[in-house]
A protein has these predicted regions:
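Helical element adjacent to the flavin cofactor pocket in flavoenzyme catalytic cores
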Residues: 140-198, 202-206
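Glycine-rich FAD pyrophosphate-binding loop
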Residues: 24-44
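Beta1/beta-strand and adjacent pyrophosphate-binding region of the FAD-binding site
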Residues: 2-15, 31
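Conserved dinucleotide-binding and phosphotransfer motif residues
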Residues: 26, 113, 164
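Dinucleotide-binding Rossmann-like beta1-alpha1 core, especially the glycine-rich loop
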Residues: 48-128
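Conserved Rossmann-like nucleotide-cofactor binding loop
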Residues: 15, 38, 206
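Hydrophobic anchor at the start of a short beta-strand
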Residues: 30, 117, 199
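Gly/Ala-rich phosphate-binding loop of Rossmann-like dinucleotide-binding domains
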Residues: 20, 24, 160
């Protein structure tokens, strides 16, 4: 049936597209529902493109570290789209003792998980980035963090997922989710009812409303 799939993903941003791509690579039948008229037109087109491990909850780090090492370096080649990914490191800046305490806590927890991150003083911060003012007294420094272009990366996930058979449907704003025998299976829009064994909500700032 046209409105059924193994997995329905709500949200056509970079997260929804990435989930769709990796599921489709494993042969999963996927539908992506996007409430707007364009794929990647929400938060995925309005961010700095940070690809970072530092500053995260330690529970996220094993997955993020795996992605940095094994997934991001080959994406442009896989997609035949330049994601503009590069690893120039990430500074998380502090101006006072309170900031330093927070950064030290984040750094300590990340090091325990195995991340290459350390605290540096203001002088070393300015050796890395001479344009920063003397107000910056400390920072955490993670040399394997980086950046990518969120627009081209989302496009790459989208184009490649489509080639793998993912069905993308725009203009389908989800208004209700329904359970069948205790399991979330139905996704309702003003125009259609979709059904899947698994439903993933990846709608960014609109996820709470859904």
């Amino acid at each position: 049936m046209a409105n059924t799939a193994d997995v329905i993903i709500i949200g056509g941003g970079i997260i929804g597209n990435a989930i769709a791509y990796y599921l489709a690579k494993k042969g999963t039948d996927v539908i992506v529902l996007e409430g707007g008229d364009h794929i990647g037109n929400g938060g995925s087109s309005r961010n700095g493109g940070g690809v970072r491990q530092s500053g995260r909850d330690p529970r996220e780090l094993p997955l993020v570290m795996y992605g940095i090492k094994n997934l991001w370096p080959s994406l442009s080649e896989e997609f035949e789209v330049d994601c503009e990914y590069h690893q120039d490191g990430n500074l998380r800046l502090g101006k006072n003792d309170k900031h330093k305490q927070i950064l030290e806590g984040l750094t300590e927890r990340a090091v325990k998980v195995g991340l290459d991150v350390r605290m540096i003083d203001g002088d070393e911060v300015r050796r890395i980035n001479p344009y920063l003012s003397d107000e910056v007294t400390c920072a955490s420094w993670c040399p394997t963090d980086g950046h990518a272009n969120p627009l081209t990366t989302t496009l790459g996930f989208y184009k490649t997922a489509r080639k793998l058979g993912v069905r993308f449907i725009t203009g389908e704003k989800v208004i209700e989710l329904k359970k069948i025998k205790g399991r979330l299976k139905k996704v309702i829009t003003p125009n259609n009812i979709y059904e899947a064994d698994t439903v993933v909500v990846a709608a960014g700032y609109e996820s709470k409303e859904i």
